[in-house]
Every structure is written in C-alpha cells, then in structure tokens.
Amino acid sequence: MSDIALSISILALVAVLGLWIGNWRICGVGLGIGGVLFGGIFVGHFTDSWGVALDSHTLHFIQEFGLILFVYTIGIQVGPGFFASLRSSGLKLNAFAALVVLLGCIVAIGLYKIFDVPLPVILGIFSGAVTNTPSLGAGQQILTELGAQEGMLDLTGMGYAVAYPFGICGILLTMWILRLAFRVNVDKEAEEFEVQNGHKKQNLHTLNVAIRNPNLNGLQLKDVPALAEGDIVCSRLKRGEKLHVPRPDTRIETNDLLHLVGAKHALEKARLVIGEVVDASLSTRGTDLRVQRLVVTNEIVLGKKISHLDLKEKYDVVVSRLNRAGVELVPTSQTTLQFGDILNLVGRQEAIESVSGIVGNAHQKLQQVQMLPVFVGIGLGVLLGSIPFYLPGFPAAIKLGLAGGPLLVALILARIGSIGKLYWFMPPSANLALREIGIVLFLAVVGLKSGGGFVDTLVNGDGLSWMGYGIVITLVPLLTVGFLARIVGQLNYLTICGMLAGSMTDPPALAFANGLHPTSGASALSYATVYPLVMCLRILSPQILALLLWAV
C-alpha cells in the first residue's frame, strides 16, 4: 500500500472511531464532533508505537483544507445575520460575549507569565478550554508563520486535547452555578422573556381593518401615514362585496376593508389611524384572487429591488410577505431579492403564473449546490488570509490566515447574496455536510499528530497541570461575565445561558441551555446573536496572543 493510500485509510479509521466516541452520552452530554480528536489521539498513539509512517504532506494538506471548508461554510451559514447582530439590539449581548473572549486572553497571558508555560502549549490550552477548533487552527498557523518547529505544533494539539473535556463541562457547570446563586425559576424567566420581547418576535401578523377615519376618504393608499412607513403591506382591499389587489395609487373610501400584514406593534399603530378591527372575511376563497408562495431562483432578478419588477403595475400582484432563511420580513419597494427568498403573492391565477416565470420558482434549484461560487469564495478567502498586515511593535505580520480569510470572505459574500449570475446560497443540508467533512478531516489529523506523545505527557509529564490551566481559562471568564450580565446587565437567565454558549461557540452547551426550557427560544436567539462576532474573535485572538508573546 502506498503512503498516501495508507494515510487516507488511517484517517478513515480515525473518523469512524471518533464519530462513534462522539455519540457517547454521559448525563446527556457528549463530545459530539470533538470525539474525532480523541479518536485521532487513540489511533495516533498506536501508529507511533508500532512505527507506522504516514505521509506528512498529505496529512498537512488534508488538515488545512478541512479547516478552510469548515470556516467557509460557517461564514456562509451565519453571514446573512452577522451584520444584523451588530445593530443596537444585540450590542449588549455582543459586548458581554466579547468580554468572555477578552478575559480568556488575559487569563491565558497570566498563566503564561506566572507558570512559564510554553507558548504552543498555552495556545492549545486556550483553544481547548473554549472548545473552539478554528482557534486551534489559527494558533497553529501563526506559529508556523513565526517559524515554530513541527514538534511545537504537536504540543499545541496536545494542549487542546487535554483542556477540551472540561471546556465542555465547564460551561454547563457555570449555568448550574448561576441558577443556584440567583435562585432562578426557569419557567418564570421564560415567561418574562416572552412578555419583554413579545413585540420583537419576527413572525408577521394579519389584521382586517375597516376605514372609519373620515380624513382618509379619497386618499391614495401610499399617502396613508400608517401605511407609508414601510412596516405594513396592504395585500387586499374589499369594497362592498368586491375583493381587489390594491396598488399604491388606489384611492380608498370610508368603510373599505383592508387586509394588513406586518408586525404586531405596527398593526396596532395602523389601526389607531385607520379605524377599527372587523371580523369580516377577506379570504380569496370563492373569488378570482389567489394566494401563492413562489421561490426566487431566477438569476435575472437576483439583486433587484421589488419595485423594479413592477408587479403591481404590470400584473396587479402584491407581495404580502417575504421569508428569508426562515425569517419573515415585511417586503417594501426597496427590498432586494436574494436567491432562495420565498414570496407570498396575492393576485389572479394567470397573473401569478406570469410572475412565477419571472422569479423562477424552480424548487429543484434549492437542492443544488452551485460549486463555482464555492471555489471563488474559498480562493478569495485564501488570498485575503495571505495578505500580511504589519503593526508596529509586533515581531511578525498579522494575517487572517486560512481560518480567518475564508471566514471573512464568506460572511461578506453571504451578506451580498449574489453578484451577477453567481449566488452564494447553499442548501442547509449541503452546508452541514461540507462543514462536518471539513471539521472531521481537521480534527482527525490534529489527533493523529498529537497522539504519539499524548499519553506520556498526561501520565509522566505536565498533562495534569495543563488540565488545571484549562479549567481556569474556562471558568474565570464564564463566571465573571455570567454574574456581571445578571447583576449589572439585568439579563434574563435563559438569555445569559445562550450568550455564554455562543461565547464558547459550543453547540452541546446550546443544546443543554435549550433543554432548560424547551418551549422558549431565548437561549437560541442570544446564541445566534453573538455567534458570528465571537467566531471571528476566537480565530483572531490566538494569533494576537502568539504575536504578543512570541518575542517576550
């Protein structure tokens, strides 16, 4: 068997063993994908003992390419929500999550100085203590740029593996400590969250309103104050027994019935201006109007504003809702269409069929992966990650690297959505498959490289000390920020749990937080809010630590 064939066969064995280990559950908590690392360590220990030589170039390529696949697909997944998470509504959560990262860096520097821990080891412990694999990849890459030897990089992997188990357990312990310390009633916290955030729910509501305000008689629909702000869509108008699709220049009359779609608070505001809620039916059933959902798949309309399609003027069709990545939005004339958007249309059947030909509505395209944009994005990401940024006082240039470059490019491209006929939509199943393949390849190689000296380090070396350092790096930032968020920030307990899980980019912790109150979305919402920013910080922080401490 050739060296390359042997290396790939061993990697397959590591993946199978590691994924099996990851499925083990102890008190409902498992290692998940992290089990591949320990599968690699186990196999690596025996390959080293038996003198099995693996092709180093093959392993190095697989490790780096796996990391690129993982961070790129992460960026594509969270990109649409990344910039929205930085707006004012998420600033407090992102600030606390960033503080977790900052405190972790400070604790790591303190341990490095006080106990004289080797730099590759403290970087590995730092990454393992926060259960962040891209952080490990970024740390190993910057050490390579600084001229570290291969053996030093193996120490980084061992430090990661030693600190990783408590990294998972530590955040669960923190949630438990916070619950006891503040005598939290989880049901009450969930109820308070719903009350406080009920008006912020993203689900749209409908309201049938009769025009009773005489000042509105004869006005064009676009001139009605409550409807001109873009928060509400009027999808149907009933005058007498006749149901119409209203246009912006449609003149309304007293006693007309309007079917409005929008957020709850916006609908209430409109009701106060227009008139009163009525129990009358504005259903399209029994009329020549239809309600139909179409998917945007035609490259020609990607990036175009809804107003440019002239749907109301040409086809007498109105877009009442827009669903993007599972989130319902109020469509306005300035809304830009992206691949995969789901439009809720109201109009005559033949008109909707004409619009269907314009927007595409080819459902099979949603299951197809356009590979050209994937490699364009990866290529641009690698190029960006290779650009050196020289900062005064640093011994080497800082780079985004193979972890940061593809991530940043993916975030931007996913936010843009499409350029010409290239669109960066990826079906969730395809994204998950590529992401899992990437992280499995990366962890398998890291485990294999670390396995040779892992047992000896743990039993005869400094492994127990490293584990202790990892516990400190895990607990100090989490407990500090958890107490601050509750006492100073007055945050909901479930929101804090989701934020802490997001600050560690830890899916098992999110699963645990969701399990505290399965019907509440508080934890998942805060996790998603902080995840994109934290992932960027987790990738950049080991590089900055390495540059700061390399010459010290």
Curated annotation (Swiss-Prot):
One Gene Ontology biological process: potassium ion transport
Record's keyword terms, sorted: Cell membrane, Membrane, Repeat, Transmembrane, Transmembrane helix, Transport
InterPro entries the record matches: AAE_transporter, RCK_C, RCK_C_sf, Transpt_YidE_put, YidE_YbjL
Compartment list: Cell membrane
Keyword DNA-binding recorded: no
Species per Swiss-Prot/TrEMBL record: Photobacterium profundum (strain SS9)
Protein name, per record: Putative transport protein PBPRA2144
Record family assignment: Belongs to the AAE transporter (TC 2.A.81) family. YidE subfamily.
Keyword Transport: yes
Membrane topology: Multi-pass membrane protein
GO cellular component: plasma membrane
Tree of life domain: Bacteria
Molecular function GO terms recorded: monoatomic cation transmembrane transporter activity
Signal peptide annotation: none
Chain ranges passing through the membrane: 4-24, 26-46, 65-85, 95-115, 158-178, 371-391, 394-414, 439-459, 464-484, 493-513, 532-552
A Pfam family this chain is assigned to: TrkA_C
